[in-house]
Amino acid sequence: MRLGTFHKKKRFYINKIKINFLSFLFRNKINNQITDPAQVKSCLIIHDNNKLGDLIVLSSIYRELYSKGVKITLLTNRKGGEFLSNNKNIFEFCIKESTGFLEMLTLCKHLRDLQFDIVLDPFETMPSFKHSLILSSLKDSYILGFDHWYKRYYSFYHPHDECLKEHMSTRAIEILKHIYGEGKFSTNYDLHLPVDVEDKIKEFIGDTRIVIINPLGAKKICRLTFEQIKVIYQEVKTHFENYRIIFTGLPQDLLTIPILEIETLPFDEFIYTVALTKYSDFVISVDTALVHIAAAYHKPTLAFYPNSRTPEYPSHLIWSPNHHKSIQIVSPTYTVKDIDTETLTNSVKRLSCIDKK
């Protein structure tokens, strides 16, 4: 066993022990249902990781709860707060600036003082003692959660999709049904953009048609090779004549692409990429967040996914594009660099047949 793997497993088991110990000190009272949905006026949603895709996939929750008169507070990091800052359905943000112990205690006290009617812990995580600290500080609120590591902290543990066979967006329906009972709820993604950002992008695009290529994700397993990028670029030029091809991603990554005179956005902030997606015609991406943004705006999309490392967590299934105009290509291995050239060329051809203007 490699040393890094050993230390990862050691942290895993130490966190499990600490979580279970803390749960006995601050065990939540079990209350299997909300007796009066009309009394739910304030809600905390816990989303304190770096995954923007999670925020997008459950964005319907913000809209649906707001329509019921619920004031939503979102616990997230600075990146998530900036991304959702223009969403008028969210009442306020609590930003987790640090995971330092003293900072976490201060955050926990602040959350406890706000006194929420309901707390939603909608995502599964690896065992985290800091996460259990947050939950233990909210024991006076009704906590609806989906992560089996924290069952003892919840008022109600929801076993939705324990076998991980459904898309994550279906969880929004389960949350709303738990609070309000059976009813018609929309799981359409709900994104909000600043007017000035949209205006700048519309001016930048003009009357041109746009194909976005996002070839280099934040994770190593979501980064195409330069040869793969060249293949995709040439195929797009062939099948999308008279379209502008705009590359998006981190500026420092885009500088490394060995293609002369590629076009990129003149804006660094990610919110401009979101706006560009809204006004684009086609999207090609390895970035799951961008794939879900494209789904929010019903854009024909070619999405490249790594295969899951373990069958127990089929990430390419539960975080799939979730849109009928999307083509999902799953690598035969856990990295997209192993998608072969024939698959790349054929998938671009297939994309060109969807709603082409």
UniProtKB/Swiss-Prot annotation:
Coiled coil: none annotated. CDD domains: GT9_LPS_heptosyltransferase (cd03789). Keywords: Glycosyltransferase, Lipopolysaccharide biosynthesis, Transferase. Pathway: Bacterial outer membrane biogenesis; LPS core biosynthesis. Transferase involved in the biosynthesis of the core oligosaccharide region of lipopolysaccharide (LPS). May catalyze the addition of the terminal heptose (heptose IV) to the outer-core glucose III, the last step of the lipid A-core oligosaccharide biosynthesis. Its EC number is 2.4.1.-. One of its GO terms (biological process) is lipopolysaccharide core region biosynthetic process. It comes from the Bacteria. InterPro entries: Glyco_trans_9, LPS_LOS_Heptosyltrfase. Disruption phenotype: Mutants are sensitive to phage C21. The keyword Glycosyltransferase applies. GO terms for molecular function: ADP-heptose-lipopolysaccharide heptosyltransferase activity; lipid A-core heptosyltransferase activity; lipopolysaccharide N-acetylglucosaminyltransferase activity. This is Putative lipopolysaccharide heptosyltransferase 4. It catalyses: alpha-D-Glc-(1->2)-alpha-D-Glc-(1->3)-[alpha-D-Gal-(1->6)]-alpha-D-Glc-(1->3)-[L-alpha-D-Hep-(1->7)]-4-O-PO3(2-)-L-alpha-D-Hep-(1->3)-4-O-PO3(2-)-L-alpha-D-Hep-(1->5)-[alpha-Kdo-(2->4)]-alpha-Kdo-(2->6)-lipid A + ADP-L-glycero-beta-D-manno-heptose = lipid A-core + ADP + H(+). Disulfide bonds: none annotated. It is an enzyme of class 2 (transferase). The keyword Membrane does not apply. Pfam families: Glyco_transf_9.
